[in-house]
UniProtKB/Swiss-Prot annotation:
GO biological process: L-histidine biosynthetic process
Protein name per UniProt: Phosphoribosyl-ATP pyrophosphatase
InterPro entries, per the entry: HisE (IPR008179), PRib-ATP_PPHydrolase-like (IPR021130)
Highest taxon listed in the record's lineage: Bacteria
Classification via PANTHER family: HISTIDINE BIOSYNTHESIS BIFUNCTIONAL PROTEIN (PTHR42945), HISTIDINE BIOSYNTHESIS BIFUNCTIONAL PROTEIN HISIE (PTHR42945:SF9)
Family designation: Belongs to the PRA-PH family.
Record gene name: hisE
Amino acid sequence: MLNDLYEEIKKRKEQPKEGSYTNYLFEKGLDKILKKVGEETTEVIIASKNNNQELVNEVADLTYHLLVLLAEKNVSLSSVQAELERREGKLSTTRDRKEIDEL
């Protein structure tokens, strides 16, 4: 499903469709796309404190906007998948991570 959505987003970038929200984002450029990613991230955080359906809706919105960002930056979804696979099964300890307050 994510692959299909990503391919459709790339198609819209290459073959714009009038009135398309995806094309609107591409036309406005990287700053607008980043603003939407930030807004949706905040909405995920807020929804996490509310109810699960709201959380699902906001995560779907964030996922879509992240895919638009990847397409804008010409980063393939398969490269993200490969990175996740590379990390699969690796153990990490709290010693390997920065304290959240330090981020």
